[in-house]
Structure formats: structure tokens, C-alpha cells
A protein has these predicted regions:
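Gly/Pro/Ser/Thr-rich low-complexity, intrinsically disordered segments predominantly at protein N-termini
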Residues: 1-180
């Protein structure tokens, strides 16, 4: 008898029902294109997220790390920025707000062990949702994606140590060394 690999893809509604029923209370997970991905926060990752929240400009915006419903996925970006006066345009279940992509000014993933999916799957996910700017922060550089398209982003710029990265929504730039 041979063994066959079984795979199961979650629907967004099915995942939300399970989430709201407490099925994942003892785990940090996110739903990405029908698959449940674990969310692991190590020391460097946690410190880098703290730096983002400390250094990103806050005038006229809200910084959060709430789940960001995106298409048929429920990613948990490490940080995202929305207009302070933005209102949700819908919801997924009773606890997750859906936002207009034009109100989401920056999405950030801090990548230690997740660089490949953050630069591939999540780049495609956030770009196709229409979020204007997406950063992937690693220990050595920040990848800035802009110009969202149906398959990702038109432009990717890498910023390394010693560089400054523009924060477009605020008209300022930050030292990469301070963020990584």
C-alpha cells in the first residue's frame, strides 16, 4: 500500500469560524492562500518590530500589527500603517476589519526565518491587494516594494547598512541601521 500526501486548503470563512471558536488560541498562525502558516517571533525579530514602532512617523496615521485581511488570506504583518481617519470598509467575522488599500500606506514584514516567503508569496499577496508600499526587513537590508500590480510590485529597491530609506507617507527618511 502506498502513502499519499493529503493536503487541505482552508477557506477564509472556515478559518475565521475556527479562529473565532478558539481553535488557534494556543498558537500564532496566519492564513496564506489557504494554508496555515505558523508565526514565530524570535529575539531579533521582536527587537526589529519594536524599532519600527518606535521610529516610524506617527503624525496623521495609525501603526498596528493587527491581522490585515487581504483577498482570501489573513496575513499578520509585523507592522502596517493606515491613515488615522480611515474607516473599515468591511469585516471578516466579528473581529477582523477590512481596509481600503488606499488607506493602508505601508506594510512591513520582519524576516529572519521567513525571507523567501516574504519576498515571494507575501510580495505577490500584498501587491495584488493594491497596498502601495511593502517592506521586507532582514538582518542586513530592507527590500522596498512599490507600484502594486496583480502579480506583485513593479519596483524593488534594496537598502543596506549605511543607507537611508524613504518613508513616503511622511516625507522623511530613516537610517536603515536604526531599523535592522
Amino acid at each position: 500500500m502506498s502513502e499519499a500526501a493529503l493536503s487541505f486548503h482552508w477557506s477564509l470563512d472556515g478559518f475565521v469560524r475556527a479562529y473565532e471558536a478558539g481553535a488557534f488560541d494556543d498558537q500564532r498562525v496566519e492564513l496564506i492562500e489557504g494554508e496555515i502558516w505558523p508565526v514565530v517571533i524570535g529575539d531579533w525579530h521582536g527587537d526589529a518590530v519594536g524599532q519600527l514602532f518606535a521610529l516610524l512617523p506617527r503624525v496623521g496615521v495609525r501603526l498596528t500589527n493587527a491581522t490585515l485581511p487581504t483577498g482570501n488570506s489573513l496575513p499578520d504583518p509585523d507592522c502596517w500603517v493606515r491613515r488615522a481617519d480611515a474607516a473599515p470598509i468591511g469585516s471578516k467575522g466579528s473581529r477582523l476589519s477590512v481596509w481600503d488599500p488606499g488607506d493602508v500606506l505601508l506594510v512591513v514584514e520582519v524576516s529572519d526565518e521567513t525571507v523567501i516567503p516574504d519576498l515571494s508569496t507575501k510580495t505577490r499577496l500584498y501587491g495584488s491587494a493594491g497596498y502601495p508600499v511593502y517592506w521586507v526587513v532582514t538582518k542586513e537590508r530592507i527590500f522596498e516594494h512599490s507600484g502594486p500590480t496583480a502579480s506583485g510590485y513593479r519596483q524593488r529597491i534594496e537598502y543596506g547598512r549605511g543607507d537611508r530609506i524613504p518613508v513616503g507617507y511622511a516625507g522623511v527618511d530613516l537610517a536603515v541601521d536604526d531599523l535592522i
